[in-house]
Design a protein with these regions (language model features):
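Conserved blade-ending motifs and adjacent loop-strand segments that build the rim/top face
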Residues: 95-97, 104-105, 147-151, 180, ...
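The canonical Cys-X-X-Cys-His
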Residues: 405-419, 440, 444, 454, ...
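Short, conserved, GDST-rich strand-edge loop motifs in beta-rich repeat architectures
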Residues: 51-70, 205-250, 338-360
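Repeat-blade elements of multi-bladed beta-propeller folds
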Residues: 25-27, 31-61, 75, 100-125, ...
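Electrostatic cytochrome c docking/interface patches
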Residues: 383-408
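C-terminal capping alpha-helices of c-type cytochrome domains
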Residues: 458-479
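Gly/Gly-Pro-rich "capping" loops immediately C-terminal to redox-active cysteine motifs
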Residues: 418-453, 457
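Conserved small/polar residues in nucleotide/adenosyl-binding loops
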Residues: 1-4
Length: 479
């Protein structure tokens, strides 16, 4: 745009070690706040609206030991479209420490609020609260939760700040949080019906366990590790959930499409899907809501009641929103079918959707699908994949090797190949061929397949580490 937002990182020659309560921190400690998705521009006020990301590392004790709000992380910001000067901002998550981005799509609407016509922007960021803000002044008008939240009890409309739940302070103990790291609403678009004044949101309920990094808790030191996710928390707790000291059970993972009233916080209706990772919706003037889902179905609902009116199996997982357009008086609806994104991290390892994920059941294919009333073309039915896990090699590994491999896998491999060795659109390593097993060290350590995108870890891990992670994968595959 006319003005770029830049963040200088001047730490290339700096040892990446940070000490608690130290006044000197390498600048890498203050990363975060990046933009992920589309910007919203509105000419009436000549403003550009952006949503910013979370802090990194997640643990604010490491990133900002003195505390504070950490402006402008997880914020909605209005910029002058000509100069780039900030006109106003609203921070959704002060003291951000949960990976709660505010980068989700920003929607513009006209609403009557408390008897006054207001020009507003609306957002459902990851933290679970739905924000209605005067887009000219930045005044917070509503902040109702659209999913269950336990990290904060509510948002105080007077101060604009969330009221934190003291029982969910992960600085003191391991706790499970709602929303988790995936958020209540992710990258997938939401849509709006201007007649009903209702927003349709593809929500997720995925709790995450947060705990301060063990080494930091004991020593006050945090060392950045290349090649992994440096959250400052025990990231491997995502796949090995400990017993919670408060005795609470973690709720099941679910995904829904909800019809949400942005002013009252009421959910008018909801559709529960077979899994959590589904597509963004499209609302039409014909009182329809279209949505694709992770089970491979593209469906249309009555916008007022949520009644399912039409469904078509595409045999492809869908996460994109559809679009509609007219050509020569004929209305079309098109959608890019294909799966991916952060859902790779969970695969089908959690929840009750095993065998229902289209990209696992049939494979992952990117296709542009277009529909119209009276269309005659058929979608090719895909055969189910053979998901029989092959015979595994004998590695003569000890329990110590396997446990060490579990930690290595969680920190270096799970982000692509799936937590607990349950992959999705990137290779599920339980299905490695005999040849791949034989070349495991050559691939993972030496980088034999680097041209295909699988970089070697010889600069980070040892050959013993590679044996340990291989042992863990084989152990999981033989259970």
């Amino acid at each position: 745009y006319k003005r770029q937002l830049l963040r200088d990182v001047l730490c290339q020659e700096t040892p990446i070690i940070f000490k608690r309560n130290s006044t000197m921190y390498a600048s890498i400690a203050f990363l975060g706040g990046c933009l992920f998705v589309l910007l919203s521009n509105f000419t009436e006020f000549n403003q550009l609206y952006i949503g910013t990301g979370n802090g990194s590392p997640w643990n604010q004790q490491i990133r900002s030991p003195g505390g504070g709000d950490n402006l402008f992380l997880s914020s909605i910001v209005a910029l002058d479209a000509d100069t780039g000067k900030m006109n106003w901002y609203y921070q959704t998550t002060p003291e951000e420490r949960w990976d709660y981005t505010a980068t989700q799509d920003i929607m513009l609407a006209d609403l009557k609020i408390d008897g006054t016509d207001r020009k507003v922007l609306m957002q459902a960021p990851k933290n679970g609260f739905f924000y209605v803000i005067d887009r000219k002044t930045g005044e917070l008008l509503r902040a109702n939760n659209y999913v269950r939240t336990n990290w904060a009890t509510h948002v105080d409309l007077e101060t604009g700040r969330p009221v934190l739940n003291p029982d969910k302070n992960y600085y003191e103990k391991a706790v499970w949080m709602l929303p988790g790291t995936f958020g209540g609403h992710g990258w997938q678009a939401m849509s709006y019906d201007p007649k009903q004044k209702i927003v349709f949101i593809p929500i997720m309920e995925i709790a995450a366990v947060h705990k301060v990094k063990e080494t930091f808790a004991k020593t006050g030191l945090f060392k950045m590790q290349p090649g992994t996710v440096n959250t400052g928390t025990e990231f491997n707790l995502f796949q090995t959930v400990p017993d919670m000291s408060d005795g609470e059970s973690i709720p099941p993972i679910t995904g829904e499409l909800i019809a949400f009233d942005p002013l009252t916080g009421e959910t008018k209706w909801s559709i529960k899907h077979e899994q959590f990772w589904n597509g963004g919706p499209l609302t039409t003037a014909g009182n329809l809501v279209f949505q694709g889902n992770g089970s491979g179905f593209f469906e249309a609902y009555n916008a007022e009641t949520g009644e399912l009116l039409w469904s078509r199996n595409t045999w492809i997982g869908i996460m994109a929103p559809p679009v509609t357009y007219m050509i020569d008086g004929q209305q079309y609806i098109s959608i890019l079918a294909g799966d991916g994104g952060a859902s790779n991290f969970l695969g089908d390892n959690f929840g009750e959707w095993e065998g229902k994920v289209a990209s696992i059941k049939y494979g992952n294919y990117g296709k542009l699908l277009t529909f119209k009333l009276g269309g005659k073309s058929k979608i090719e039915e895909l055969p189910e994949r053979d998901l029989t896990i092959p015979q595994q090699p004998i590695l003569n590994a000890s329990l110590e090797n396997i446990n060490a491999g579990m930690d290595i896998y969680a920190n270096y491999c799970a982000i692509c190949h799936g937590s607990g060795v349950h992959g999705k659109t990137i290779s599920d390593l339980r299905y490695m061929s005999e040849s791949t097993h034989e070349n495991f060290k050559n691939i993972v350590f030496d980088g034999m397949l680097e041209e295909n995108g699988m970089k070697g870890f010889s600069d980070i891990l040892t050959e013993e580490n590679i044996f340990e992670v291989h042992s863990y994968i084989v152990d999981v595959a033989t259970r």
